[in-house]
Amino acid sequence: MARRSVLYFILLNALINKGQACFCDHYAWTQWTSCSKTCNSGTQSRHRQIVVDKYYQENFCEQICSKQETRECNWQRCPINCLLGDFGPWSDCDPCVEKQSKVRSVLRPSQFGGQPCTEPLVAFQPCIPSKLCKIEEADCKNKFRCDSGRCIARKLECNGENDCGDNSDERDCGRTKAVCTRKYNPIPSVQLMGNGFHFLAGEPRGEVLDNSFTGGICKTVKSSRTSNPYRVPANLENVGFEVQTAEDDLKTDFYKDLTSLGHNENQQGSFSSQGGSSFSVPIFYSSKRSENINHNSAFKQAIQASHKKDSSFIRIHKVMKVLNFTTKAKDLHLSDVFLKALNHLPLEYNSALYSRIFDDFGTHYFTSGSLGGVYDLLYQFSSEELKNSGLTEEEAKHCVRIETKKRVLFVKKTKVEHRCTTNKLSEKHEGSFIQGAEKSISLIRGGRSEYAAALAWEKGSSGLEEKTFSEWLESVKENPAVIDFELAPIVDLVRNIPCAVTKRNNLRKALQEYAAKFDPCQCAPCPNNGRPTLSGTECLCVCQSGTYGENCEKQSPDYKSNAVDGHWGCWSSWSTCDATYKRSRTRECNNPVPQRGGKRCEGEKRQEEDCTFSIMENNGQPCINDDEEMKEVDLPEIEADSGCPQPVPPENGFIRNEKQLYSVGEDVEISCLTGFETVGYQYFRCLPDGTWRQGDVECQRRECIKPVVQEVLTITPFQRLYRIGESIELTCPKGFVVAGPSRYTCQGNSWTPPISNSLTCEKDTLTKLRGHCQLGQKQSGSECICMSPEEDCSHHSEDLCVFDTDSNDYFTSPACKFLAEKCLNNQQLHFLHIGSCQDGHQLEWGLERTRLSSNSTKKESCGYDTCYDWEKCSASTSKCVCLLPPQCFKGGNQLYCVKMGSSTSEKTLNICEVGTIRCANRKMEILHPGKCLA
């Protein structure tokens, strides 16, 4: 053995001496340079201090040692400070509330640790109105009017109960008749069922339904916990008491990251109103189908905890119900405070005043649900420690459930699994798997706050006392929360008040604007595919599994993905109403765009809705009450002994002097809608037999409607209607070209050529192929060579009108093919104009210009074209622009004898002057080349 070791040492020493290598650290590094950026990933470098000495040369240090190193630095994102816009002008003084307001918007939320916005966004001030308030008192008809203006049934007057809310229905009553034979207590916490709910904040708001109102009906319900029944309010359809505390309904969920815990911001839910209409709002609330904490403080706390390390989460929750309830579908009694707020809304739309309704009362109300409590904890675990524990996700969930049953609920005969106490994570904490968690976030709802706080787990705590959970459970019965609920829009409650229809429409408009303020589209993209979420005026980053850090900028060692999922940018403003009386808005999947295999945005890219407009003179918002909201319906037919019923007008036409019945011999006039014109005889005459004498008449379109194209395309000029002969140009973003013709002309009632619905943009391969070369050339290594018309021009390029001097004919050619052939010294091809060849002045001038060009002394390349003596090249458009005659040079060899206009005299002009006059389309006859003889 010793001999073998000596032999090994001798061989090793011989090898080292034979191939000596450079010890690079013999030459020290300089200090790292300053970072090139203070944030957003800069670079810094250092250099090796080389001394070219004998050692350096003999040991091949030049080949072995690296001389410079570079590394990333300051990779944290630059802070984005919150930015507010300027206040707009004061609104008009509203005559109904005698207030005016001014608003400003959040131009940019804070992000990545930037300064937050703390200043108010709305300012109000009292004012003296110059107009009269159009809001009239509600007509109670045969009902009793309360002092507050509320209308209630006559039978509720003098019944010993405060049905008006201001006790005006019990004033000056002689004798009262009680509704119930005895007094009943209200259902405990019944007022919670009448609260509004803010779907964006995920929390209850002010009272919208008055659940102390019983409507003169003595309806009771009994609980198994008490001997005395409770009085059921008029707003509730039914109530059922129950207490659910089953031990086997403890549920656990595993989350690799928080993105799946909060709802996707693109999800939409449609809420139908009682009036039959519906509108869509984002779902950010908890219901029977979804549990979401996206916008409350607990979710923010969870996000901040996940920033500290790569984390996974286990959520354990249990629902305890005290009672279930269902709200009536109609005839709901509003709370006094909500009714007063609605009555004080102005008639004219004011975004600031209408938005306050949602701040104070939420956006929805409860249509059904339960009162009770939810035991709900979210445990944060280190992803690395969970992985090293050896447990699967299902096993980890099971261990949390078992330990909660034993140490929180104190369920007897709980069998503890061996793997839950002997895994690597539990062994560090005396057999407790939960003690291995980094943190817990309490999502507990219901019960007394001190008992709920006692249930929250803290790292290193000794555990709960046996009575803690049972004390909280008992307190839930007295202090419940609304859980497992369903919602309807608060706008549906705005009924049976003065100007109800007008105010409902204003609230719907305000809700759309209000919801847009909570859209995370305003946030900048988060690093490592994090999902941005907007909390107030601050953007937070929800980290994907395998990432962490204040802004998700750090990666765990096993994080390999570099995909970037797409997120929606913000919606554009609504377009103006087009000829079909619709308007639209769009958004782009560009915040960021999907990259490296990332997911595309889900949801609609374009929204369209009908326009609302008035056919009468605009004198401000009309006061429309519920009973005045009429729609156009077919009027009942009127029977008469003589005359003619209303005739049917042609498509896209209407009767100017419209009525139900016309006398014998009376004429009606047919008119056409905007954009159409009458063709034929436009008068009908009523005959004695009750029929109409009418000739052929129709409404033909005399304008083209703005075409519907893909959102990526831009239409220039952008108009609602285009007259016959007008053209549009379709363009794409930089780096893309239209995958088809780009120029279209309105001819008759349609576009020529027809515009395909599938027309879109494609990558500008021509520009990419060209590189830094001239038009018609492509880059081949460091050289520029001519493109091949056959190989390089298979993709679409715009049409050009081209003249071939060999065949003495003109034709339409793709731009790529024309440029390639021109580059290959095909001099017989001449550019005439952009677009397909069509008869007209543009083609005539192009042909004449080509004939003149043969004598031009100047030939300057300019885009597709070549500029001649009478032209200059525009740097901004790459097109030839004609000079004015005074700008031409004097004299020259190329002279012409011409006659100007109707003049009989002859005049000698040079080629530049001739070209400028013909370019201006002025009349001129060329008599012969050369000077005039006389």
Swiss-Prot record:
<feature type="disulfide bond">
    <location>
        <begin position="158"/>
        <end position="173"/>
    </location>
</feature>
<keyword id="KW-1015">Disulfide bond</keyword>
<feature type="region of interest" description="C5b-binding domain">
    <location>
        <begin position="642"/>
        <end position="934"/>
    </location>
</feature>
<feature type="disulfide bond">
    <location>
        <begin position="499"/>
        <end position="623"/>
    </location>
</feature>
<dbReference type="InterPro" id="IPR048828">
    <property type="entry name" value="C6_KAZAL"/>
</dbReference>
<feature type="glycosylation site" description="O-linked (Fuc...) threonine">
    <location>
        <position position="392"/>
    </location>
</feature>
<feature type="region of interest" description="Factor I module (FIM) 2">
    <location>
        <begin position="858"/>
        <end position="934"/>
    </location>
</feature>
<feature type="disulfide bond">
    <location>
        <begin position="526"/>
        <end position="541"/>
    </location>
</feature>
<keyword id="KW-0245">EGF-like domain</keyword>
<dbReference type="Pfam" id="PF00057">
    <property type="entry name" value="Ldl_recept_a"/>
</dbReference>
<dbReference type="InterPro" id="IPR001862">
    <property type="entry name" value="MAC_perforin"/>
</dbReference>
<feature type="disulfide bond">
    <location>
        <begin position="180"/>
        <end position="218"/>
    </location>
</feature>
<feature type="disulfide bond">
    <location>
        <begin position="786"/>
        <end position="837"/>
    </location>
</feature>
<dbReference type="Pfam" id="PF00090">
    <property type="entry name" value="TSP_1"/>
</dbReference>
<dbReference type="InterPro" id="IPR036055">
    <property type="entry name" value="LDL_receptor-like_sf"/>
</dbReference>
<comment type="function">
    <text>Component of the membrane attack complex (MAC), a multiprotein complex activated by the complement cascade, which inserts into a target cell membrane and forms a pore, leading to target cell membrane rupture and cell lysis. The MAC is initiated by proteolytic cleavage of C5 into complement C5b in response to the classical, alternative, lectin and GZMK complement pathways. The complement pathways consist in a cascade of proteins that leads to phagocytosis and breakdown of pathogens and signaling that strengthens the adaptive immune system.</text>
</comment>
<feature type="glycosylation site" description="C-linked (Man) tryptophan">
    <location>
        <position position="32"/>
    </location>
</feature>
<feature type="region of interest" description="Factor I module (FIM) 1">
    <location>
        <begin position="766"/>
        <end position="840"/>
    </location>
</feature>
<keyword id="KW-0180">Complement pathway</keyword>
<feature type="disulfide bond">
    <location>
        <begin position="523"/>
        <end position="539"/>
    </location>
</feature>
<feature type="disulfide bond">
    <location>
        <begin position="589"/>
        <end position="601"/>
    </location>
</feature>
<dbReference type="Pfam" id="PF01823">
    <property type="entry name" value="MACPF"/>
</dbReference>
<feature type="disulfide bond">
    <location>
        <begin position="521"/>
        <end position="570"/>
    </location>
</feature>
<feature type="disulfide bond">
    <location>
        <begin position="793"/>
        <end position="816"/>
    </location>
</feature>
<feature type="disulfide bond">
    <location>
        <begin position="773"/>
        <end position="823"/>
    </location>
</feature>
<comment type="similarity">
    <text>Belongs to the complement C6/C7/C8/C9 family.</text>
</comment>
<feature type="domain" description="EGF-like">
    <location>
        <begin position="523"/>
        <end position="553"/>
    </location>
</feature>
<feature type="disulfide bond">
    <location>
        <begin position="867"/>
        <end position="919"/>
    </location>
</feature>
<feature type="disulfide bond">
    <location>
        <begin position="146"/>
        <end position="164"/>
    </location>
</feature>
<feature type="glycosylation site" description="N-linked (GlcNAc...) asparagine">
    <location>
        <position position="855"/>
    </location>
</feature>
<dbReference type="Pfam" id="PF21288">
    <property type="entry name" value="Kazal_C6"/>
</dbReference>
<keyword id="KW-0472">Membrane</keyword>
<protein>
    <recommendedName>
        <fullName>Complement component C6</fullName>
    </recommendedName>
</protein>
<feature type="domain" description="TSP type-1 3">
    <location>
        <begin position="565"/>
        <end position="612"/>
    </location>
</feature>
<feature type="disulfide bond">
    <location>
        <begin position="732"/>
        <end position="761"/>
    </location>
</feature>
<feature type="binding site">
    <location>
        <position position="169"/>
    </location>
    <ligand>
        <name>Ca(2+)</name>
    </ligand>
</feature>
<feature type="disulfide bond">
    <location>
        <begin position="577"/>
        <end position="611"/>
    </location>
</feature>
<keyword id="KW-1134">Transmembrane beta strand</keyword>
<feature type="glycosylation site" description="N-linked (GlcNAc...) asparagine">
    <location>
        <position position="324"/>
    </location>
</feature>
<feature type="glycosylation site" description="O-linked (Fuc...) threonine">
    <location>
        <position position="38"/>
    </location>
</feature>
<feature type="disulfide bond">
    <location>
        <begin position="96"/>
        <end position="133"/>
    </location>
</feature>
<dbReference type="InterPro" id="IPR035976">
    <property type="entry name" value="Sushi/SCR/CCP_sf"/>
</dbReference>
